[in-house]
């Protein structure tokens, strides 16, 4: 996330906070700013909390915020992994391998390279 995205998300949160505050004011206006002695303060608080949670669950912006936050948790290959894979795909031994390998297979540029399997048996055969 860059700073512009974070700033826009902060603005969305601020507007949501203002709407929540207005909803609280509406609820308080419906029930009266101070509950009378006969009403139970706990039930009024429970109603306010349930109304607020309902509003917050129905708000589409919360889904967007959750999606944005979950994008950070997505598995993304890091540059370190790319460099490791690049190193593994390159040949690990680059020194000219003279006098080894099979020229016919392209593993040596030396025409006098060792051949495998050997065409001549070593003397004495089999070795002791």
Curated annotation (Swiss-Prot):
Keyword Coiled coil: yes
Main localization category: virion
Pfam families reported for this sequence: Cauli_DNA-bind
Gene3D superfamilies in UniProt: 6.10.250.630
Domain of life: Viruses
Localization per Swiss-Prot or TrEMBL: Virion; Host cell junction, Host plasmodesma
Ranges annotated as biased composition (Pro residues): 119-128
Region of interest called Disordered, as start-end residue ranges on this chain: 98-128
Coiled coil location: 1-30, 37-58
GO molecular function: DNA binding
Similarity field: Belongs to the caulimovirus ORF III family.
Physiological role: Plays a role in virus cell-to-cell and plant-to-plant transmission. Interacts with virion icosahedral capsid and movement protein, thereby facilitating virion cell-to-cell transmission through plasmodesmata opened by viral movement protein. Also interacts with aphid transmission factor, attaching the virion to aphid stylet when the animal feeds on an virus infected plant. Aphid saliva may later detach the virion, inducing release of infectious particles when the animal feeds on a new plant.
Quaternary organization: Homotetramer, through coiled-coil domain. Homotrimer when interacts with icosehadral capsid. Interacts with capsid protein, and with Movement protein.
Protein name as catalogued: Virion-associated protein
Source organism of this protein record: Carnation etched ring virus (CERV)
Native organism taxonomy: Viruses, Riboviria, Pararnavirae, Artverviricota, Revtraviricetes
């Amino acid at each position: 996330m860059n700073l512009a995205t974070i700033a826009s998300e902060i603005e969305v949160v601020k507007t949501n906070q203002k709407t929540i505050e207005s909803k609280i004011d509406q609820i308080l206006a419906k029930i009266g700013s101070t509950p009378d002695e006969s009403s139970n303060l706990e039930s009024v608080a429970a109603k306010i909390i349930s109304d607020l949670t309902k509003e917050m669950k129905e708000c589409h912006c919360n889904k967007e915020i959750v999606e944005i936050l979950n994008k950070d948790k997505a598995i993304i290959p890091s540059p370190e992994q790319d460099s490791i894979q690049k190193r593994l795909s390159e040949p690990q031994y680059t020194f000219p391998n003279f006098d080894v390998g099979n020229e016919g297979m392209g593993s040596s540029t030396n025409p006098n390279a060792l051949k495998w399997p050997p065409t001549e048996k070593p003397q004495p055969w089999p070795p002791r």
